[in-house]
């Protein structure tokens, strides 16, 4: 099976300016993400960026990079530009990894590509089981649920499904006994579908929830969803996240 990883890497970030270039254990963050993608068995790994400085850094460490517009509203739009510029075949599997996930397990990068390859759908993603009450009611944790065939029914920042007879008194033990799922933001697409996806008008649901994947469900597409074989560790959204990741990678790199 052939698949291509595309890593969108935006230069601007409100909370962490120049985030992809921040140093972690002696390397820029984007290099750690690129190395994890390389370890997944991908046929090709492309960094998609809107800034020449990131382009130069990726070129220096030997990565393939595509300079894209800085006008995109989402990472998926950036993917579509790369697919068009690089003339990637419509049937190629594309895995989208965020550029702020330096601890992404290579195992699940390969897993989401394999899941798409095995199912007659245009999009696949992963989830892990929720284990705490705090996560269950946290709007920053995206919840999801599937039908009997492993197809996503919905994604929400709200608590789904809602246990009418158990909330809000439930505890961690209750959550662990149920099948509540936390969505992981890693996707596999068929390249031709990405071009269709960005051509669709944004929907009220995706705008209300601030969840772009709801566009696919709104337009009638199936999204395959499976439990990740390995739970990813923290991504880098804040300065606190950055320090945690630095501590983890400093330890790993010193072993």
Curated annotation (Swiss-Prot):
SUPFAM superfamilies in UniProt: Nucleotide-diphospho-sugar transferases
Pathway per the UniProt entry: Nucleotide-sugar biosynthesis; CMP-3-deoxy-D-manno-octulosonate biosynthesis; CMP-3-deoxy-D-manno-octulosonate from 3-deoxy-D-manno-octulosonate and CTP: step 1/1; Bacterial outer membrane biogenesis; lipopolysaccharide biosynthesis
Protein EC: 2.7.7.38
A GO BP entry: lipopolysaccharide biosynthetic process
MF terms in GO: 3-deoxy-manno-octulosonate cytidylyltransferase activity
Keywords assigned by UniProt, alphabetized: Cytoplasm, Lipopolysaccharide biosynthesis, Nucleotidyltransferase, Transferase
Record localization: Cytoplasm
InterPro entries referenced in this protein's UniProt entry, alphabetically: Cytidylyl_trans, KdsB, Nucleotide-diphossugar_trans
Catalytic activity: 3-deoxy-alpha-D-manno-oct-2-ulosonate + CTP = CMP-3-deoxy-beta-D-manno-octulosonate + diphosphate
Superkingdom to which the source organism belongs: Bacteria
UniProt KW Transport keyword: no
TM annotation in the entry: none
GO cellular component: cytosol
Alphabetized PANTHER family for the sequence: 3-DEOXY-MANNO-OCTULOSONATE CYTIDYLYLTRANSFERASE (PTHR42866), 3-DEOXY-MANNO-OCTULOSONATE CYTIDYLYLTRANSFERASE, MITOCHONDRIAL (PTHR42866:SF2)
Chain's role: Activates KDO (a required 8-carbon sugar) for incorporation into bacterial lipopolysaccharide in Gram-negative bacteria.
Sequence similarity: Belongs to the KdsB family.
Protein name as catalogued: 3-deoxy-manno-octulosonate cytidylyltransferase
């Amino acid at each position: 099976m052939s698949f291509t990883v595309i890593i969108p890497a935006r230069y601007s970030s409100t909370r962490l300016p120049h985030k992809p270039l921040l140093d972690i254990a002696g390397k820029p963050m984007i290099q750690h993400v690129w190395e994890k993608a390389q370890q997944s068995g991908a046929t090709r790994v492309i960094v998609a960026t809107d800034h020449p400085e990131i382009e130069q850094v990726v070129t220096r460490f030997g990565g393939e990079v595509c300079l894209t517009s800085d006008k995109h509203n989402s990472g998926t739009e950036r993917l579509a530009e790369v697919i068009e510029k690089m003339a990637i075949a419509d049937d190629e599997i594309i895995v989208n990894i965020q550029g702020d996930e330096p601890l992404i397990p290579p195992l699940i990068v390969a897993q989401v590509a394999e899941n798409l390859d095995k199912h007659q759908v245009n999009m696949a993603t992963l989830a892990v089981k929720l284990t705490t009450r705090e996560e269950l009611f946290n709007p920053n944790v995206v919840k999801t649920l599937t039908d009997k065939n492993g197809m996503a029914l919905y994604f929400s920042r709200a608590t789904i499904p809602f246990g009418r007879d158990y909330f809000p008194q439930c505890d961690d033990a209750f959550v662990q006994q149920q099948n509540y799922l936390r969505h992981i933001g890693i996707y596999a697409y068929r390249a031709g579908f990405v071009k269709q996806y960005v051509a669709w008008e944004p929907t009220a649901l995706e705008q209300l929830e601030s969840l772009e994947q709801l566009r696919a469900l709104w337009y009638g597409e199936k999204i395959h969803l499976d439990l990740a074989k390995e739970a990813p560790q923290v991504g880098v959204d804040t300065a606190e996240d950055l320090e945690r990741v630095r501590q983890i990678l400093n330890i790993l790199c010193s072993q």
